[in-house]
């Protein structure tokens, strides 16, 4: 089973993915590291720009039929059995990305993406089996337990659990206005 864990930068994908893989006994794959290792895409500053079709082709060739948890904000474009879209309060995203040294423009871009569900919409356009999990105020263990519970119950689709439309005023300082 291929489980893709995706979401806006700063939601906790890597931490949750590694823990989920450990609890399931699956291999953990960082999509970014995989792309670099395979020579897919090119670095532009600190960012890796990849051709999504080439990435998905190579990933499917190398991992089809294997049990993996793959982490990356493009992982929802893969042919996965389940896509987990992690969400976090946009203010929290802004704080985390600012701490990581992201430019004001990049922080604003990602806060806005979280605010208007960009990754969730993309995931739903690409996949049937999508579950959305709000990580706000939860430990990585709590998030992983929620995901495992949904998997054990056979839940293949759960969306609409997050609505940030009421928090717009809180995140204005992070937006590119």
UniProtKB/Swiss-Prot annotation:
UniProt region (LID), positions on chain: 99-109
Catalysed reactions, as listed in the record: AMP + ATP = 2 ADP; ATP + H2O = ADP + phosphate + H(+)
Keyword rRNA-binding set for record: no
Pfam families for this protein: AAA_18 (PF13238)
E.C. number(s) listed in UniProt: 2.7.4.3
Residues the record lists as binding ATP: 10, 12-15, 100, 138
GO function term, MF aspect, one: adenylate kinase activity
Keyword entries, A-Z: ATP-binding, Kinase, Nucleotide-binding, Ribosome biogenesis, rRNA processing, Transferase
Single Gene Ontology BP annotation: rRNA processing
Region (NMP) residue spans: 30-50
Entry similarity comment: Belongs to the adenylate kinase family. AK6 subfamily.
Function according to Swiss-Prot or TrEMBL: Broad-specificity nucleoside monophosphate (NMP) kinase that catalyzes the reversible transfer of the terminal phosphate group between nucleoside triphosphates and monophosphates. Also has ATPase activity. Involved in the late maturation steps of the 30S ribosomal particles, specifically 16S rRNA maturation. While NMP activity is not required for ribosome maturation, ATPase activity is. Associates transiently with small ribosomal subunit protein uS11. ATP hydrolysis breaks the interaction with uS11.
Subunit structure, interactors included: Interacts with uS11. Not a structural component of 40S pre-ribosomes, but transiently interacts with them by binding to uS11.
Name listed for the protein in its UniProt record: Putative adenylate kinase
Organism: Thermococcus gammatolerans (strain DSM 15229 / JCM 11827 / EJ3)
